[in-house]
Structure formats: structure tokens, C-alpha cells
Swiss-Prot record:
Function: Adds a myristoyl group to the N-terminal glycine residue of certain cellular proteins.
Subunit description: Monomer.
Organism, as annotated: Cryptococcus neoformans var. neoformans serotype D (strain JEC21 / ATCC MYA-565) (Filobasidiella neoformans)
Enzyme class: transferase
Nucleotide-binding among keywords: no
Coiled-coil region(s): none
Transmembrane segments: none
Active site, renumbered: L493 (proton acceptor)
Domain of life: Eukaryota
Zinc among keywords: no
A Gene Ontology biological process term: protein localization to membrane
Name used for this protein in its record: Glycylpeptide N-tetradecanoyltransferase
Subcellular localization, as worded in the UniProt entry: Cytoplasm
Amino acid sequence: MDSSDSKAATDEEIRRALKAADLMKILDGKIALGNKSGTKNLGEHKFWKTQPVPQITGSGAPAPIEEGPIDDPKTPADVRQEPGVLPAGFEWSTIDINDEEQSKEVYVLLCENYVEDDDAMFRFNYSREFLLWALTAPGYLPDWHIGVRVQKTKKLVAFISGIKIDIRVRAKTFPAAEINFLCVHKKLRSKRLAPVLIKEVTRRVNLTNIWQAIYTAGVILPTPIGTCRYFHRNLNPPKLVDIGFSPLPRGSTIARLVQQYSVPSHPRIPGFREMKKEDVPQVGALLRRYLDRFDVAQAFRDDDEVEHWLLSGQGKEVGGRRVEQVVWAYVVEDPTTHRITDLISFYALPSTIMKHPKHNLLNAAYMFYYATDVVFPPSSSSANSDVDVDANAGESSVAAVGTGGEDAKTKKKLETRLNALTADILIIAKQAGFDVFNALTLLDNNMFLQEQKFGPGDGYLNYYLYNWNCAPIDGGHHSTTAKQGSKIGVVML
């Protein structure tokens, strides 16, 4: 090979590496809203200095504070009754996400503006089914799905959403809003609509006597309660190499990559099957108890929530990958007792691949909630006890010991079980046609990431609480090799 061929090969390697980095950033959440800075546009620090959030001190660390609400107690009567003022030429619009035309407007806005790389190579592809699943959880309020339209044309140019969620932070459980999908049209970023949208959704949430919120961002705002890192598991090496997601290592071949990332043809855990509606009470009890081990977690106060998040997005028809399916949930049923001993689930969020001659969609799966009873004493495990966890209890029904509170023997059992569960769910994802399986360092994911061949991404996801002082919570991103679980038990879409 002459020097020109060598240079061309080097240039090609650089091009593919840069392309892969762009896609990794998208999957990691580092590139968002299509802005050139590659950050999630949740408002400038100047705006957040006016909000009831812990402030970053001069040393870069949050000031020592007592956990609890930041603002003085208020009532809905103290809240402004009229919407905030928008720039001239724009108007507020409450979005009916169940209306096909309006949900399509949100879908188009998000797909074209929410997340893409600077070269418009990849975009998140939110389906209508995904948005319905994400935004219509039990108790949702249509008033919390807020849009901004151009007055003359009625074109939807901005959106923000909130859904009700019960959050437990250590020993305290309280109602909150989960804020998501803040999106402003790329051509209107100079209008500073993001802070206006945040203020408006805050106003509407406060009118329902809810004063706290949880949200995430790939950038540092005042002030994260914890940070998780993204990891990715290759399921389709030929395609990921072809689109530039994964470089082909020097001296390697596609065949070697296929062998390296191959999975068995069938799940191996006895009793591993798809979750059914009749499993909901047992799954709910198991999931609540498992999440009690974390410092921050969704409370899942009733089984309606469990059914919605794990079953309502299962799609239509049966067998294989269903039409309109967005969530996959599997359980392990003890063959002898017929008790549910384990749960594992994931959801689908594909990305459109722009300007590629062969591929137009990256099928990405994201680890969702899971639980197993191996962390509990045999006498009280869900598989060996008839004692039910009260689904409607106001406080955690099991003392929150925090992940990492188990002894070494129990931790080893947990590690072994989670690796087995993850190995089986990777098989399901592969059979369903997914190209990559993504996971954060939350929950107990660190116990299986390395063994199941997940590779680290370069993105981090920061968790935030609005109007709640909170000591830092370990997001697990420093301890993947130590297989130490994190203290974050909330999975946000």
C-alpha cells in the first residue's frame, strides 16, 4: 500500500470514529434539542438562580442544607391564576395527546428538534405510541401537556410535559411532577422560550397543590442530586459498524465481532416468560420492595401504575415484536410455587439515521425497571411468603436499607441473578430486532454491565429535584468495576 492509500485509510478511520462519537452522544443524551452547543436546553444558569433549587457555591459544591422543601409552604391560592406572558406572535396551547392530529404535531416537533447531532445524521424517532405511553400514566392531567403555537399559523413550535409521580427520597415520600420533553423549535432558540415553558408548567403543577418535581439533563445545572453514566451493548455488529456506531478494531473482522457479541438462541432461566395482567399484584409488591433499597425511587403507590408502565405499551397482536409495541416486560415464575420471583423490562426508543444509503433506523432498547427476590431473606421473599406489600401504603412498607446494605453472600447472589436475567432479556431484544441495548449506572446495573459486554458511553445523565433540598445520591458512575450498585432507583424516559 502506498502512502496515499495509507492516508486515505487513516482519514476513513477518523471519519468513522467521529461519526460513531456523534451517535454515541445522541444515545447518551449529550446532544439534545438540536442546538449547536450539544446540550439539553433547560434554561440558563441565570434563570435557575431564581428558582427553588440548591445553588452551586463558589467552591462548586452545594451548601450544606437540611433535606426537605426549599420554598416556604404555599397553597394553590398563592399561585398566579393566569398563564405567563409569551413573546408577541405566540400563544399557549394545551395539547390533547390522545388526539391523533395533536399527538402527531408533538411527534413531528420532537423528531425534528428535540435531539439530533449538528450534522443532522441521527434523530430520536418518538412514535405516537411511545408518547401516549409516556404521557398518559394513571392520574395524568392534560393541562400539564403544554404547547406554544404561532398565533397566525397555529404551528406548534414548543412543548413541555409533566406527569404525576410519587417520589421517595430516603425516608420521605411526596407527590411530584416528572418533567420531560422540553423542546423549542431550532429557529426560535433566541426567543428564550425554555424558561417561560418551565415557569408555566410549574404554575400549573402548583395549582394542583404539588410543589416538587424531578427532571434530568445531560448538562450541569444548579444542582444535580446524582449522576449516572450511559453504557451500550452491541446486538447487531454489522449494522453498527456500517452506520459508524462501532468502529471495526484494527486486525479484527465483522465475523469476530458477531461472535463476540452473540447471544444464545433462547432464554435459559426456568419459568422466564412474558408478563401478563394477572401478574400485576405480585410484580407490584416485588418491585416496590426492591426499590425500597434505593435512596430515591418511584413509589408506585398502586397497581394501576405498575400495569401502565409494564403492560400498556405491549402493543397489538401476539408473537414476536408486536405492532405499536414500546415496552417489553418479562417475569420468572417459580415452577413449584407459581410465585413471581423476578421482573425485568426494557423500552424501545429508535433513532432515525439520516443520509445513509442502506439503513434508516437504529433500533435502540433501553433498560427499564427490574426486581428480584434474591436480596431478601428466604422467609420473607416474595416467592416464599404470603405476606403482601400494601400497594397503597403512604410510607415505604419495608425499611429502606439502601443498595449495598446486603452482606457479601447476598450481593453475590444478586450479581449472579441479575447477570442471568440480563442475559435472557438481551436474547429477547435480539430476537425483536434491536441493534443496541442501552443502560445507565442506576439501580444495580453495575453488577452486570461488564460481564454482559456493555461498553461505556461518553455521556452522563444528571438527576435534579425541584424545590427539594437533598444530600448527594450516588449514581454509580464511579463504581462500575467494583460492581457497587447506585442509590438512584428512578428510571426516566
